[in-house]
């Protein structure tokens, strides 16, 4: 793979139509907005979608969501321990942090792209503060900003009901309170996010030109296989991806 030689800046423009692009769990899962009513989609949400797309495209991903995982590991520690090279490096008496980071970056695309903090206790089940542990931070070259809407967004909230009770009560014919709920959506929002790929950090993690091209393809199809009841098929759409490749490293 060829090393990344030129800095890359990018802008992703997308729309949300009758959808909840990113619910806020602290606000009843209403679409995120700032105090002015400008819609927001967090960088964490965007990176989650990018990871999912890269996983669909066959890339090895370290931070996999539980409902989209491609292996049998149920935690990050299990996944790290499942990498033979990484496990052997962690067992060494004299730990080489640079070697550990190099293996992790080589193994997982998202680690060499977004970075990762490996902070695991070595003695399983030990809560002792003095127990041996490993804490290695890796800075990734790819950064993405929170997406914001170009204008204020109108949020529509709809009362919904379930057709059946969750549990059988004393009176099976009586509707339980849990059959009532709320569903929120953005009528329409045009969102923009900006990001970049840093050459200096790419050299440290091994992020290559080929990796940059894969990132570009993942962003162009970021909403593929991302459909849910909150984001029905066709409700989230990429309008444009502007990809600036500089003629210098900075």
What feature does the model see in each segment?
Residues 1-250:
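RNA-binding basic/glycine-rich loop and surface signature characteristic of RAMP-family CRISPR effectors
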């Amino acid at each position: 793979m060829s090393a990344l030689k030129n800095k890359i800046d990018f802008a992703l423009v997308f729309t949300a139509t009758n959808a909840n692009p990113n619910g806020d769990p602290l606000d009843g899962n209403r679409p995120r907005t700032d105090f002015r009513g400008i819609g927001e989609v967090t960088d964490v949400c965007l990176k989650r979608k990018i990871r999912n797309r890269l996983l669909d495209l066959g890339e090895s991903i370290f931070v996999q969501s539980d409902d989209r995982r491609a292996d049998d590991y149920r935690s990050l520690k299990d996944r790290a321990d499942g990498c033979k090279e990484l496990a052997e490096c962690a067992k060494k008496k004299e730990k080489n942090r640079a070697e550990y980071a190099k293996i992790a970056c080589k193994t997982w695309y998202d680690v060499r792209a977004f970075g990762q903090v490996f902070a695991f206790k070595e003695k399983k089940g030990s809560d002792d503060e003095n127990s041996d542990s490993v804490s290695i931070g890796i800075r990734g070259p790819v950064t993405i900003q929170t997406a914001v809407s170009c204008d204020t967004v109108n949020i529509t909230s709809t009362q919904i009901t379930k057709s059946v009770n969750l549990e059988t009560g004393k009176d099976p014919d009586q509707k339980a309170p849990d059959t009532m709920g709320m569903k929120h959506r953005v009528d329409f929002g045009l969102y923009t996010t900006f990001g970049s790929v840093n050459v200096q950090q790419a050299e440290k993690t091994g992020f290559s030109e080929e990796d940059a091209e894969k990132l570009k393809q993942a962003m162009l199809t970021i909403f593929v296989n991302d459909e849910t009841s909150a984001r029905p098929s066709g409700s989230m759409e990429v309008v444009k991806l502007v990809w600036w490749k500089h003629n210098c490293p900075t």
